[in-house]
Amino acid sequence: MKLLDLTLPSPAENLAGDEALLATAEAGAGGEVLRFWESPKPFVVVGYANKVASEVNVATCAARGIPILRRCSGGGTVVQGPGCLNYALILRIQADRPTGSISMANQFIMERNRAALAHAASALLHPPSEFRVQGHTDLTLDGLKFSGNAQRRHRQFLLFHGTLLLDFDLSLVSELLLMPTLQPTYRDRRNHDHFLTQLPVSRDQAKTALVHAWQADAPLSDLPPLRIRELVAEKYSRAEWNFKF
């Protein structure tokens, strides 16, 4: 698997970067990749089918100049920004392997990530804490969420990407997001302030844990610039896409 640690200048380009990796692999010009990125400024990302007005405090975002974008994968709405580390996995779909179906891929990827991050944090937590996969694709620490994840599939490859809250300003979530319309049972109607936590590891520790877990030891120098420009122009810079629901 190849490794790319690259943050692009804008939110639109970073979302397009994940999708471009998937498109490149599907076209036969790429393969399995682990990418990291972290936005230097806050923005809101809604899941593909989310309704912006139902999930986002649109007026507050507008007043503060915080962009609202839509990603190509499912899942819920999140706030991005400094202290929120993003990863993206491009994996080959094989019918007889754990990537063969949506549910199998969710279980396989989430458990591998859980084990890797729990191991990285174990030496720092006294007393020991419980790391679990909860909901469909959440990672929790003692029942508090620190990672949300989503999947997008093509015929030959899938994109599985997510966030890791490390030293993020969690107050932004309550300011910018409404209570989600769909909630996992384990949330138990808790508000954002009582539902989220940070993973107590450094960026380098989190990255190293996932790099080792996925054996991403072959460097990838760059993202496909032409495809990114096309995706930004066609989708991620357009209100027709970002506010389609």
Residue ranges and their predicted role:
Residues 138-141:
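Glycine- and Gly-Pro-enriched alpha-helical subdomains that act as flexible
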Residues 39-41, 132-136:
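Short Gly/Ser/Thr- and Asp/Glu-enriched loop/turn motifs at secondary-structure junctions
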Residues 104-131, 147-245:
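Long, positively charged amphipathic alpha-helical accessory segments at protein N-termini or as interdomain linkers
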Residues 1-100:
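N-terminal lobe of the biotin/lipoate ligase/transferase fold
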